[in-house]
């Protein structure tokens, strides 16, 4: 009893600490649940209203309908034909949709021993089987060796000479959207049609991120892989897309407050940006950025291992709000432990690289928003991800 009484303050402090973390976990669970409901409702409403979207004939004769340059970076991709079939089957005027496959020169020099030929040659063979009007929609470019890998491939596909061939010399970059899909993506055929309808309705944004589900190869995964596929897909639903939807709502709410109470808004703006703004998440596929915006950013970021996360931070630093795209896209989850480890290592390398980007952004513009992005990134990813890397193997994943 003497020992218990002597250590009472210690146990009380431990009780407070565990109560805090349990409360935090319960709050995060509630937020995630609300995020899942928000995204699911957003997607369900969009699919229920598909019949109200303008069809191909209307979009073909609408002068304000956007033009899409849809990029597919590829490297050793034997099953790329499935992605190209899905993209070329989009319900959008074929003269306003251009699919560009960007391969690497390294693959030509070192073909994969298990592939019958290179990815570029597979695409060319696939194109030869298409009708003439679809052949015109599909282009193949080969990026030389350089740092940046995927980002370099994407930027190479957007060179002026390539765009001039696709769009002509008098194209308006504000009416051109650059889409990105992985070589294992299966996008919904109504994706471009939904985006065009949003633009024509006056709601068009400079960038969009769509709902992605890592379920394309679900049947080929073992039980652990299926759990990871469901978990990763749930993160996209309850966090990534929900955050985009709610961020637009929060900023719109604050704009209304500023219009009604400008003095109050000016006083609380730093607190709002520091405590209530959230980072925008780009996933690297099923994303669209307006060409003029992408050019203003200097193209896809090449300084980090993950150009997608850096792109989201760069858009946020410039005050550009991304729109959520409700159409679904299925992608593969790595099917082997080796591929999964390499994917996660690349992601974490990108997390570390983004620390430098966010630090430079904050030093260049020391705003509460940029400070919040840096602090949250360090706390939520740089610190929590290594902990997860230790905990998951212990529990069997």
Predicted regions and their residues:
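Short aromatic/hydrophobic "clamp" motif used to bind/position activated sugar donors
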Residues: 178
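A conserved hydrophobic helix/loop-capping motif in glycosyltransferases and polysaccharide synthases
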Residues: 68-76, 90, 102-104
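Catalytic donor-sugar/metal-binding loop of nucleotide-sugar-dependent glycosyltransferases
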Residues: 303, 312-330
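Active-site-proximal specificity loops/subdomain of glycosyltransferases
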Residues: 110-175
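Cell-envelope/extracellular polymer assembly enzymes that use nucleotide-activated donors
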Residues: 66-69, 98, 310
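Short, acidic, metal-binding catalytic loop of nucleotide-sugar glycosyltransferases
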Residues: 85-96, 106
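Long helical/loop segments within the catalytic core of UDP-sugar-dependent glycosyltransferases
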Residues: 127, 131-133, 149-167, 189-304, ...
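N-terminal membrane-anchoring/stem segments of glycan-assembly enzymes
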Residues: 1-60, 269, 380-387, 391
């Amino acid at each position: 009893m003497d020992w218990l009484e002597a250590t009472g303050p210690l146990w009380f402090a431990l009780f407070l600490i565990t109560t805090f973390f349990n409360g935090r976990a319960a709050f995060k669970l509630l937020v995630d649940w609300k995020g899942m409901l928000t995204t699911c409702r957003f997607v369900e409403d969009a699919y229920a209203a598909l019949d109200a979207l303008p069809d191909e004939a209307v979009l073909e004769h609408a002068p304000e309908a956007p033009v899409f340059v849809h990029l597919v970076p590829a490297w050793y991709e034997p099953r790329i034909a499935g992605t190209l079939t899905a993209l070329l089957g989009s319900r959008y005027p074929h003269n306003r949709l251009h699919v560009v496959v960007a391969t690497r020169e390294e693959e030509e020099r070192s073909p994969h021993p298990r592939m019958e030929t290179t990815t570029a040659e597979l695409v060319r063979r696939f194109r030869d089987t298409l009708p003439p009007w679809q052949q015109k929609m599909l282009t193949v470019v080969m990026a030389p060796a350089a740092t940046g890998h995927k980002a370099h491939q994407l930027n190479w596909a957007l060179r002026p000479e390539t765009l001039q061939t696709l769009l002509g010399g008098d194209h308006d970059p504000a009416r051109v959207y650059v889409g990105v899909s992985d070589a294992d993506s299966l996008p919904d055929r109504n994706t471009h049609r939904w985006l065009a309808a949003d633009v024509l309705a006056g709601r068009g944004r400079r960038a969009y991120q769509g709902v992605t589900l890592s379920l394309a190869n679900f049947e080929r995964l073992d039980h652990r892989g299926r759990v990871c596929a469901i978990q990763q897909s749930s993160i996209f639903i309850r966090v990534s897309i929900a955050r985009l939807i709610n961020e637009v709502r929060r900023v719109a709410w604050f704009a209304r407050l500023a219009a009604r109470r400008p003095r109050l808004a000016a006083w609380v703006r730093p607190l709002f940006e520091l405590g209530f703004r959230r980072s925008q998440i780009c996933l690297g596929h099923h994303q669209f950025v307006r060409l003029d915006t992408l050019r203003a950013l200097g193209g896809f970021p090449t300084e980090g291992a993950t150009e997608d996360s850096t792109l989201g931070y760069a858009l946020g630093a410039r005050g550009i709000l991304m729109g959520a795209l409700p159409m679904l896209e299925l992608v593969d989850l790595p099917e082997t432990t080796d591929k999964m480890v390499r994917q996660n290592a690349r992601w974490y390398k990108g997390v570390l690289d983004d620390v430098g980007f966010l630090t430079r952004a904050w030093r260049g513009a020391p705003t509460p928003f940029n400070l919040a992005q840096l602090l949250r990134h360090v706390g939520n990813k740089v610190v929590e991800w290594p902990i997860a890397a230790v905990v998951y193997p212990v529990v069997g994943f």
